[in-house]
Each structure stands twice: as C-alpha cells, then as structure tokens.
Amino acid sequence: MVLIIVAFCLLTASAGPAGAAEQSSPPEVVKITAKRFEYSPNEIRIKAGVPVVFEFTALDRIHGFTVPDLGGIRLTIEPGKENRITILAPKAGTYQFHCDIFCGDGHEGMTGTIIAE
C-alpha cells in the first residue's frame, strides 16, 4: 500500500501543474467596423482550425453579421455595445458573410469574405 502511494506521488510530482505544458495564448482579435452598406475590413484572413474573436463596432445603426457556410454563425451588431463572436473555420477555404438586418438601399452590398488558410 505504501509503495502504491509513493509511486502515485512520484508520478504526479513529475507531471507538474495541470495544463502547464498546454498554456495557450489568448485568441487573436479582429476588429471590424460596420456602417451603412459596408464592413471594414471586408476581407479577413484567419488560420483554419484556430478560434478567432471578431469584435464589431457599429458606427451608425444596428447591423447583422452572418456566415451561412460556418453553421449559420450570427450576431446582431448594436451601436454602443460590445459585439463579439468567436469564429472557427474548421478547414481552409473562403467563407462569405453578410448583413442580415436591412439597413437601407445598398444593404445587399454589405458583404465580406473570410479566408481561412
């Protein structure tokens, strides 16, 4: 019994603190502005398989953000509020996004592209 306890203590002590080898840096944050009929930037490059936080600022009114090909990710972007969403592109490719809240004539041109590499 004592031998088992000693062996367990040696194993856990040599392993170090839980997660010490797996410390990861905070996710990348991409800042995006949304205003009538455009996102800036409207082309965003990210790494496939790595979570990225998109942080939106609405400059004029409520806008939407949706990426149909990434499981229908969706966010309402409100002026004066923190608007964040984590994006994970599982594989390399091009993913289109658009505003899904009508914001006037020209709304259909409020689009962009996520390029996962």
Mark where each language-model region is.
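Extracellular/periplasmic metallocenter environments
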Residues: 15-21, 78-117
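Beta-strand cores of secreted/periplasmic/IMS beta-sandwich domains, seen most often
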Residues: 28-31, 42-61, 80-91, 95, ...
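Bacterial N-terminal signal peptides
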Residues: 2-13
